[in-house]
Every structure is written in structure tokens, then in C-alpha cells.
Swiss-Prot record:
Family affiliation: Belongs to the metallo-beta-lactamase superfamily. RNA-metabolizing metallo-beta-lactamase-like family. INTS11 subfamily.
Class of this enzyme: hydrolase
Major site of localization recorded for this protein: nucleus
Pfam families per UniProt: Beta-Casp, Lactamase_B_6, RMMBL
Motif mapping: HXHXDH motif: 67-72
Additional observations: CPSF73-I and CPSF73-II are not functionally redundant, but both are essential in plant development.
Key word Hydrolase present: yes
MF terms (GO), sorted A to Z: nuclease activity
Designated name of the protein: Cleavage and polyadenylation specificity factor subunit 3-II
InterPro entries per UniProt: Beta_Casp, INTS11-like_MBL-fold, MBL, Metallo-B-lactamas, RibonucZ/Hydroxyglut_hydro, RMMBL
Recorded phenotype for the gene knockout or disruption: Embryo lethal.
GN (gene name): CPSF73-II
This protein's UniProt keywords: Hydrolase, mRNA processing, Nuclease, Nucleus
Amino acid sequence: MAIDCLVLGAGQEIGKSCVVVTINGKKIMFDCGMHMGCDDHNRYPNFSLISKSGDFDNAISCIIITHFHMDHVGALPYFTEVCGYNGPIYMSYPTKALSPLMLEDYRRVMVDRRGEEELFTTTHIANCMKKVIAIDLKQTIQVDEDLQIRAYYAGHVLGAVMVYAKMGDAAIVYTGDYNMTTDRHLGAAKIDRLQLDLLISESTYATTIRGSKYPREREFLQAVHKCVAGGGKALIPSFALGRAQELCMLLDDYWERMNIKVPIYFSSGLTIQANMYYKMLISWTSQNVKEKHNTHNPFDFKNVKDFDRSLIHAPGPCVLFATPGMLCAGFSLEVFKHWAPSPLNLVALPGYSVAGTVGHKLMAGKPTTVDLYNGTKVDVRCKVHQVAFSPHTDAKGIMDLTKFLSPKNVVLVHGEKPSMMILKEKITSELDIPCFVPANGETVSFASTTYIKANASDMFLKSCSNPNFKFSNSTQLRVTDHRTADGVLVIEKSKKAKIVHQDEISEVLHEKNHVVSLAHCCPVKVKGESEDDDVDLIKQLSAKILKTVSGAQIHESENCLQVASFKGSLCLKDKCMHRSSSSSSEAVFLCCNWSIADLELGWEIINAIKLNH
């Protein structure tokens, strides 16, 4: 069974995540995002690579969205309402609840405020979300007769999932964005040990290994505190869901401990709704937040207030969380234009910014001016501080997950090409797993392993207790355990399979036992050579056998002998069917037969007793 992985977005870049995997002719789309740093046709994935005719319903079996970030869900309303896809769409309950907020906020910023072309409307968003089927963690969904999917906790943001998809014997995992460590409000990614043909993993921080979070938190708090203590304003661009809550919890706690009276603001609107959903979806948060929730709501911040636009020009220090996080548009960019020219102020960038955004330009080096989308230039005299509070896993986390799942192949997406190539070599050399880094529009093909599921008979299982059955010395079951046992695999016409003991074959097949034997009439003495009787001759032959076959257990009678299944008796026939036609008629013959199980023993005895030996 073949597996084809077509990368429509996030191939050797970060943005517009969209991967289409074909298993035995059926296509699954993982994520349907937009590129936050593009404002042309490159904003969306090239959907024509799926179907040139535009018949997406027949081309795609289902779409699975891993989380609500725009680079993973931003193109979905366009694909369903403009391109016409009407098939099943799956996402977690939090993602279904929060995606409409993110999509509408983006539409409002880009169209209502910036006057860009409207690629999807508010109605499109609403109609798109009506088609979404919400799923629980570890709930196995039977998409159709052959395809099943299951979601696993990914950390990263509220409701983010990794997706396991299985069709027949082929199985894959698409990680989406994930975090292998806990933070203040979310837990670490959790997934079962699975047999996989393919792992498709994000690689945002393909070469970064982060140390303890506490020095980073301290550095961030000191930078913000120093700014406001000097009378400046600190702008923290962040997405309304995820990093904003993480940093609000951090600052709110620090403000309490340090008794700081400088106001902390949240840009009004979307973040208020986001905090409401966090309170409703507390079960998706970290264990620490769940425990705190028993006594108080950890998202009811004591020192955080709503921000009014009139406060942009208000005197005095303050801290402001404003969306979006990459300074690509919206309120955060508007505030940046006003605050960037002052050397007292600070822009604290807590996460990754894609190429083409103002955030990325600031991270690349401290510029003196920044060009905005409409040709406006902004003088940058403020301090710029970058601290890695990213909810993405680092290189160690990617390696740990890959080693844990031990897939047959790995495809890396959602990263920067130079770093991805380094990680690719690391996975190949250290884990001995083939790894691929396709660009957008490229397809990588794999062959999946065919497995046969078989029941085992009682007799076969009992036979496994013999010394030939090798159990692992490990106290835990491992996929790599080497276990061997002799049995016969029987596959019926119905394709049901069973492993049975060899002694059960005739019963299972409703056939009689057949025994394969060998026979040979062997010359052992020349007639008249001596006057020995039959008994003496048998004794002489037994002595020859003992010289050749050490320790042989020989049973003798008047005119025959037996060793294991080998039986030999003096032949009185003038012509015997087991005798060679070239044999001398002047010889005495021993007519022998033995089981094929004693093939080597039989011929060893023949060579020992035959005439002229």
C-alpha cells in the first residue's frame, strides 16, 4: 500500500500549513492555513495541486485542523465557501469554539481597517464552522469504512492536537504544532506508542535546544520592569490565545510580589472572549491550573485591565498586550507606530515571527526605520527585546518524540530550510530513520508495511513455553523484543488468519496426515563371502553404525535393525523397487526406509553399512 505526502504549505518555511496525505487513493488534508507574511496569491496553499477540476469533494476524504492559529486554519473558510469543499472537517472542541473568533478578527483587521480584498466574509466563516465535527481526545473516529482518525493532546495552545490516521495497514501521525514541555497554563504533548509508517513533524526550532524556562522568565520580567521603572511603555505583541495568557499569569504574579502599581493592559475585544473560553475549557489546561481552579480562577488577573484606544497617547508608564503577535497588522502594529520612536519604550517579542512581518524585521536586527504595508516608515528608537516563550517544541523535543514513536519514515515541515536540513541529518544518523524535507508543491512517496492480524491456537501458545521461545529480559514490553516460535500461519478464504501448532494442521485443514519417507535397498555383503547367519550380519552392521554415528540407539531383531525413524531389514527379493539397477546380483541387501525428519541420519547410516565401505 503506497503513501504519498504532498506538501501544499509549510514546506521549508513557516506559514500556511497544509499537508495532503494519500493512502491507497484516499486523501486526507491536515490543516488549511494562510501565510501571515504574504498579501498576494502565495497567501493560500495551491489547492489546484489536489484537483485541477476543482472537484474537491471527490478528491478529499476529510480535513483535520490541529489548532486555531491562522497559519493552520486561516484558509479554511476560503476552501469550503469559495472553492466549494463540503466534505467532513474535524477539529477539537476548543478549536471549533475559538477558530471563528480568530478568523473574524483577522478578517476585520485586514478588510475593515486595511482595506484589503475580502477573500472570505463573516457569513463564509459561519457557514464553514457549521460543517465542522468536534472530536474529543483519544476518540477514534471512523471517517468511512476504511479510514479512522484519533486526536492526541499536543500542548502548544488550548485545544491543539496531534492526529493519528490509520487506513488498513498504513498508519501516520501529523503533529501540527506541539510542545514537549509543560508551561504555566498548558501541559506537555501526550501520545501513545504507535506503529507508524510515517511521522510528519513540525520543526520550527529544528536546531534550538532551550534550557530552563526560569532564566528566560527572569530576563523578560527584568526588561519590562526596567522599562516601566524608567517611565516607558512596554508593548508585548502576542496572539490573544495562548502566549498572552501565559505571560499575563507571569506578569500578574510578579506585579503582586513586587507591589508594582504600573497598569497592565490587554487590548479589548478578542482577548476578553479568549479568557472566557479559557475558563470554560479548563480541562484542556495544565495540571497546575486545574488545581488552582479548585480555589480560584487563575485567569482572573488582579493587575490586568482592558485598554482603551485613548490611552495610546496617555502619559506615564504602562504594559500593553496587543494582537497580533507578529506585528503584521491590527492593533499591535497601530500602537507600535506611536510608541516605537521613543527611546524610553520597549517592544518585547515573546515568540517566533514569520518572514515578511514587522516582528521578523525587528528580530533580524535592530533597524532604525521599518517600512509598513502601506509605504509608511516608522522610526525605531525604542528598545527591542526578544525572549523565547514559544509554545513550540525545541530540537530535543522533536528528537524525543521521533525516538519514542520510532516511525519508518519522517517528513519535516513548518521550519526554516537550513535548520531543517541539519535536523534531517541528525534524525537519519542518530535514529537511523529516513527523513525528508519537501518544499511546497513536492510529493514524497513511501511504501507501507502490510501486517496480518492472526489469532493463536491454544496448542501453539502452550508450545511457546518451550526453550525455543525466547522472551525479552526487559520488564516492560517493547516493540523491538525478539520473540521466536515455530508455528504455521493459516489464512482462510475470508482472510481470517490463525497461527497453529504443526500437529494441528490436518485438523484445521480437514485433511489426513501425510508422512514423507525415503527408501533405499543397500548392498551390505557379497554372497558366499562368509557363513554368517542373519543375526550375525545384523550385529556386524550395528557395529559399523556405532563407529560412524556416535551414541546411536540401535534396536536389533533377527533380520532387521532400527535407529530413530531409520529401519533396515534384510531383503530377500531378487528385484526390489528401491534397489539400483546397477547393483550386483551377487550381493546381500538391506532394504531401508526413514522419515524425512531424519534425512541426514539416514544417509549417514547408508554410507556406513554399504558394501565396500
